[in-house]
Amino acid sequence: MYDLTGKHVCYVADCGGIALETSKVLMTKNIAKLAILQSVENQPAIARLQSIKHSTQIFFWTFDVTMARQEMKKYFDEVMVQMDYIDVLINGATLCDERNIDATINTNLTGMMNTVATVLPYMDRKMGGAGGLVVNVTSVIGLDPSPVFCAYSASKFGVIGFTRSLADPLYYTQNGVAVMAVCCGPTKVFVDRELNAFLEYGQTFADRLRRAPCQSTAVCGLNIVTAIERSENGQIWIADKGGLELVTLHWYWHMADQFLSYMQSTDDENQEQFVSGQR
């Protein structure tokens, strides 16, 4: 179990919907500090969060997840002045706009990766940090394809690939930063929006999604925090239909484990075995 008591949490997302509900639950876990970085100011939401736990310090910054990494560094230098350190980084910014592929990829994938790359040095044990946990909030259509929301699905597949790659022991054993992901199923705040399909053939299905059964943002937020508390490095969870399920991960490339051993080995014999296995 990961104990959130006394932790310094940084949440990068819009303070509404899933992010707001997740933050409400976090405020009941006796965290010491909560930094919220979002694209627009939402003072009523901040006030609601503060009313849950007056002793938890809440800090807010307007933040564009698609900004260049150099600009991100300036923001997080300011964040660290107030936060001292970050125990938990939650990436929750998301966009589903099939008519704007660049914005969808930049928000869901590129921006998230730049955020992680910017924050990791502050958390890295070998760089003076205390280790910690990175949580990538993503979607179930990052695990299985969506013929309707193709660009959105592709960006979320990227999040899963990034999460699993960064969770490799090659990094974790050195920097002490665990990485996990929570894949949310259809949730009210998402399906309530007007959504466009990638191709017009799928628009009927996109429209029908607005009437489909879905979980509430409150239940999804609760399960995200539960997944964090149960987390181990590299885990992928599904938060859907009010439940929480641990994903069984598979290696589809039969040489994957041998390739990693080869990359980490200085032994000529091991390298020769890898080359022989490919023939």
UniProtKB/Swiss-Prot annotation:
Q: Which GO terms describe its cellular component?
A: cytoplasm
Q: Which CDD domains match?
A: ADH_SDR_c_like (cd05323)
Family, similarity comment: Belongs to the short-chain dehydrogenases/reductases (SDR) family.
**Can you name the source organism?**
Drosophila madeirensis
Which Gene3D superfamilies does the entry mention?
NAD(P)-binding Rossmann-like Domain
Q: Which residues bind NAD(+)?
A: 11-34
Give the protein name, as stated in the record: Alcohol dehydrogenase-related 31 kDa protein
**Catalytic center residues:** Y152
Amino acids binding substrate = S139
Please state the span of the N-terminal signal peptide per the UniProt entry: none
Q: Tell me the keywords, alphabetical order.
A: Oxidoreductase
| An annotated Gene Ontology molecular function | oxidoreductase activity
